[in-house]
């Protein structure tokens, strides 16, 4: 029941991030299917215990619950483009970040690792607008394309530091290097 309550609270946050990034071009959703929806979890486990013992593993329970990720009314994994799937993932992560920030006692860090791969320019620009604001706090962005990263940082216009990682060594880049 708590998982279902969480999903009900989480969906609008997630949808608002996806809607912003995609500029309202697509509708997305999440649904939670639980084995214990019509009966208590204890009843579900008791009912399947004999079969579970024969099989050697549990066939029902919370570990078998499904979180359905939808683009319109269809599974995004099967129907979405690579860019739509990436947008979905980014929106999920931003919604998780926002949820943790609002419900937790500390502000989490946000790591966007090679985030702009597979995204068109308009989606990248929308993500930049989101991360440029003060609402997200400290953010780490990685990208293997230096020119691409320079364009992104120029658009953000916020304070930032740039680091180079070579052979496991991290060094801050001086302004003239950046």
Question: Residue spans of the language-model regions?
Answer:
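Conserved NTPase motor "head" modules and their coupling/switch loops across ABC/AAA+ ATPases, GTPases
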Residues: 1-109, 118, 122, 126-138, ...
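Walker B catalytic acidic pair
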Residues: 113-115
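H-loop (His-switch) motif in ABC-type P-loop NTPases
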Residues: 142-144
């Amino acid at each position: 029941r708590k998982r279902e309550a969480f999903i009900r609270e989480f969906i609008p946050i997630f949808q608002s991030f996806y809607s912003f990034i995609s500029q309202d071009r697509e509708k997305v959703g999440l649904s939670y299917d639980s084995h214990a929806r019509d009966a208590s979890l204890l009843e579900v486990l008791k009912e399947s215990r004999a079969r579970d013992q024969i099989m050697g593993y549990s066939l029902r329970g919370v570990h078998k619950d499904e979180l359905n990720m939808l683009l319109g009314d269809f599974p995004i994994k099967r129907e979405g483009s690579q860019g739509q799937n990436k947008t979905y993932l980014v929106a999920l992560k931003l919604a998780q970040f926002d949820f943790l920030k609002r419900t937790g006692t500390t502000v989490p860090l946000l790591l966007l690792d090679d985030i702009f791969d597979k995204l068109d320019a308009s989606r990248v620009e929308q993500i930049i607008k989101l991360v440029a604001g003060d609402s997200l706090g400290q953010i780490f962005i990685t990208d293997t394309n230096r020119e691409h990263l320079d364009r992104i940082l120029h658009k953000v216009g916020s304070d930032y530091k740039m680091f180079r990682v070579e052979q496991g060594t991290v060094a801050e880049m001086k302004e003239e290097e950046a």
